[in-house]
From Swiss-Prot:
Native source species: Oryza sativa subsp. japonica (Rice)
UniProt motif (Q motif) ranges: 86-114
Protein name as annotated: Putative DEAD-box ATP-dependent RNA helicase 51
Domain Helicase C-terminal residues, every copy: 329-481
Enzyme class: hydrolase
Helicase ATP-binding domain sequence ranges: 117-293
Compositionally biased residues, Basic residues: 554-569
Length: 590
C-alpha cells in the first residue's frame, strides 16, 4: 500500500468553497483614486462613488453569507442527502412557528422530522432514533412548542414542557434552538443546569418557565428543594440522547424524576442516536409494559435498514502509530491544519490529558481551545461558543463534547485516544459531516496491538480505511520535549514545573482509562510498553504512579483509623502496640 500524505489533504471538497477573508474582499483595485480624508472637500460625485462601492461590497458580503447559510441548511435541495421533498410550509403549524422556521432558513424536512413530527403533533408517545446531525432537535421541539401554543400556556400555568439533556453544553444548545423557534411566541423559556447558582434558577422557576431545558441532576434538585417550581400541569416530557443519559449513571435520578412527575395526560418522547438494551429497558420504565407500549407507542427508526452506521459524506480512516510517536504525529497534523485554516476536534480519554495537551500545544504556539468536565461551567460555555463561532481552529475535548453538539463546519475529527465502545465512535465522528450533504473526515489513532478494534467497528457497519503518515512529515521534536540528562539544558516539559506536573497527571489518567476500558481483550494494560507511553507524554522514563483503581483517600483514612487512628497500633485492644504484640521480649507483663 502506498503511503498517504494525509495531513496535506485538502480539508474540504472543491465544490465547497470557503468564504474569502473580509480584508481581501475589501481591497480596492489599483486604478481606484486615493480617498479624500477631508469630508468637507468631497464633491458629490466622489461621495456617490464611495457610497456605491460600500453598498456593492455590503451586498456582496450579504450574498456570500446567505449562500453559506443555504448551503449549510440544504435550502432548495429537496430529496438530496438527508432531506426529503416535504416542506415545513406544509406542516399544520401556527404562523408564529412557521415564521421562525423561515427566519432560520429551513425549508425541507429531514427524514427523522418527516416521520416523527406528525405523530407527535397528534399527541402520541414516540420513541425515535436517527444518526447524529439528522435534525432531531427540531423534530421534538416544534410539536412541543405547538402544543403549548394551542393550549395558550402562560407563566402562571408553570412548566408545560421539560426537555432533559445529558450534558450542560447540549442543554444550552437546545435552549438556543428553542429560543429561535419561540421568538414570536408569548410562552416563556429557560434552562437549569449544574454549575450555576441554584437560587437564581429557583427565582426564574417561581416566575413560571413554560419550556424548561434541564440536566437530570439539577432538575431533580429543584423538584425536591424548590417549592415554587410548578410542574403539576406538565404536558410533555422529552428525553434527548436517552442512551447517553443512561450511560452517565442518571438511571436512579431518572427513576426518582418519573415518580415525582405527573403521568396522566403527559406525552413522553425519547430520542437517541443509537438503540441499546439499556434504552429498551428505559422504555419499559417510561412507557409501561410491553402490551401498553404496543398499544400507544409510536416507534420511529430512521436507520434500521441502513447498511452504514454513519452518514454518507464522512470519510473515515485509522492510523497505526507507536506510542512514542503519537504526539509527534498529532503535532504535525495540527500544524498542517492550522496552516490550511481548518476546523478540528481532538478527543482524549481523560480530563487531565486534555489539560496537559492544551497547555503544551499552546506553549509551542499551536493555539487551541479545550473543554472537559473539570472546567467550571462558565468556562465550558464560553469556550464552546468561541469555537462554535470560529471559522477555523482546534478544540481538544473529552466525550463531554461527543454527543448532540451542533458545531458548524468541522473538517476533521481526530480520536487521539480510541473510544470505549463503538457507539462512542459513532457519536464522536458525528460532530462532522452534519446536515444535508455535509462533508468531513475522521481519523482514529491506534497502537499496533489495538487493531482488533476494527473488527468491532466492522460489526457495527462502520467502514474505515488505513492512512499512513510519511515519516518525513513528522518533525524531529521529541528530544526537545522531555528532560534528557545527557543534555545540560532544560527541555520544554522537563524544565517547566507546571507542564511537568500536568504531564504526570495526564500520564496517570491515561493508564487508568486504559485499565478501565470495556474491551479488555484489546486494551490490555499489561501489554503496554510504559517507556513508549511515557515518551508520548514527554518523559524519557515512566514516572512512578499508583494504578490501584480501588484506592481512594477515604479508604486510606479508614485504614489509618484502625486502633484509634495511631500508626503505632497502640489502643484499648492492644496496649503494647504493633511491634509489642509480636515480640514477647520487648515488653514484660507484671
Amino acid at each position: 500500500m502506498h503511503p498517504i500524505k494525509l495531513c496535506a489533504r485538502s480539508p474540504r471538497p472543491s465544490s465547497k468553497k470557503r468564504k474569502r477573508p473580509a480584508a481581501a474582499a475589501a481591497t480596492p483595485p489599483e486604478s481606484e483614486p486615493e480617498p479624500v480624508h477631508n469630508t468637507a472637500a468631497c464633491n458629490s460625485e466622489g461621495e456617490n462613488n464611495a457610497t456605491g462601492k460600500r453598498r456593492e461590497h455590503n451586498n456582496k458580503k450579504m450574498k456570500e453569507e446567505k449562500s453559506k447559510r443555504k448551503k449549510k441548511q440544504g435550502e432548495g435541495k429537496k430529496g438530496s442527502g438527508i432531506l426529503t421533498d416535504k416542506l415545513f410550509s406544509d406542516l399544520p403549524i401556527s404562523d408564529l412557528t412557521a415564521n421562525a422556521i423561515r427566519d432560520m432558513n429551513y425549508t425541507h424536512l429531514t427524514e427523522i422530522q418527516a416521520r416523527s413530527i406528525p405523530p407527535l403533533m397528534l399527541g402520541s408517545d414516540v420513541m425515535a432514533s436517527a444518526k447524529t446531525g439528522s435534525g432531531k432537535t427540531l423534530a421534538f421541539l416544534i410539536p412541543a412548542i405547538e402544543l403549548l401554543c394551542r393550549l395558550r400556556f402562560s407563566p402562571r400555568n408553570g412548566t408545560g414542557v421539560i426537555v432533559l439533556c445529558p450534558t450542560r453544553e447540549l442543554a444550552i444548545q437546545t435552549h438556543n434552538v428553542a429560543k429561535e423557534l419561540m421568538r414570536y411566541h408569548s410562552q416563556t423559556l429557560g434552562y437549569v443546569i449544574g454549575g450555576i447558582d441554584l437560587r437564581g434558577e429557583a427565582e426564574q422557576l417561581a416566575k413560571g418557565i413554560n419550556v424548561l431545558v434541564a440536566t437530570p441532576g439539577r432538575l431533580l434538585d429543584h423538584m425536591q428543594k424548590t417549592k415554587s417550581f410548578k410542574y403539576e400541569c406538565l404536558k410533555c416530557l422529552i428525553i434527548d440522547e436517552a442512551d447517553r443519559i443512561l450511560e452517565q449513571n442518571f438511571e436512579e435520578q431518572m427513576k426518582q424524576i418519573f415518580k415525582l412527575l405527573p403521568r396522566q395526560g403527559r406525552q413522553t418522547v425519547l430520542f437517541s442516536a443509537t438503540q441499546t438494551e439499556k434504552v429498551e429497558d428505559f422504555a419499559k420504565l417510561t412507557f409501561g409494559s410491553k402490551e401498553e407500549r404496543q398499544r400507544t407507542l409510536v416507534y420511529v427508526g430512521v436507520d434500521d435498514h441502513e447498511s452504514k452506521a454513519t452518514v454518507e459524506g464522512l470519510k473515515q480512516g485509522y492510523c497505526v502509530i507507536p506510542s512514542e510517536r503519537r504526539f509527534l504525529v498529532l503535532y504535525a497534523f495540527l500544524k498542517k491544519a492550522l496552516s490550511e485554516k481548518t476546523k478540528v476536534m481532538v478527543f482524549f480519554s481523560s480530563c487531565n490529558s486534555v489539560k496537559f495537551h492544551a497547555q503544551l500545544l499552546n506553549f509551542i504556539q499551536i493555539e487551541c481551545y479545550d473543554i472537559h468536565g473539570q472546567l467550571k461551567q462558565h468556562q465550558r460555555t464560553s469556550t464552546f461558543f468561541k469555537f462554535h463561532k470560529a471559522e477555523h481552529g482546534i478544540l481538544l475535548c473529552t466525550n463531554v463534547a461527543a454527543r448532540g453538539l451542533d458545531i458548524p463546519d468541522v473538517d476533521y475529527i481526530v480520536q487521539y485516544d480510541p473510544p470505549d465502545e463503538t457507539k462512542d465512535y459513532i457519536h464522536r465522528v458525528g460532530r462532522t459531516a452534519r446536515g444535508d450533504n455535509g462533508k468531513g473526515s475522521a481519523i482514529l489513532f491506534l497502537l499496533p496491538k489495538e487493531l482488533q478494534l476494527l473488527i468491532h467497528l466492522k460489526a457495527a457497519n462502520i467502514s474505515v480505511s488505513e492512512y499512513v503518515f510519511r515519516q518525513e512529515l513528522v518533525p524531529k521534536l521529541q528530544p526537545y520535549l522531555h528532560y534528557d540528562s545527557s543534555f545540560e539544558q532544560e527541555k520544554i516539559v522537563g524544565g517547566n514545573y507546571i507542564l511537568n506536573r500536568s504531564a504526570k497527571e495526564a500520564y496517570k489518567s491515561y493508564l487508568l482509562a486504559y485499565k478501565s476500558h470495556s474491551m479488555k481483550d484489546i486494551f490490555a494494560i499489561h501489554q503496554l510498553d510504559l517507556t513508549s507511553v511515557a515518551a508520548s507524554f514527554c518523559f524519557s522514563e515512566p514516572p512512578k504512579v499508583n494504578l490501584d483503581l480501588e484506592s481512594s483517600a477515604s479508604k486510606h483514612r479508614k485504614k489509618r483509623n484502625v486502633n484509634t487512628g495511631r500508626r503505632h497500633g497502640i489502643g484499648p485492644s492492644n496496649p503494647y502496640g504493633r511491634k509489642g504484640s509480636d515480640d514477647r521480649r520487648q515488653f514484660a507483663r507484671f
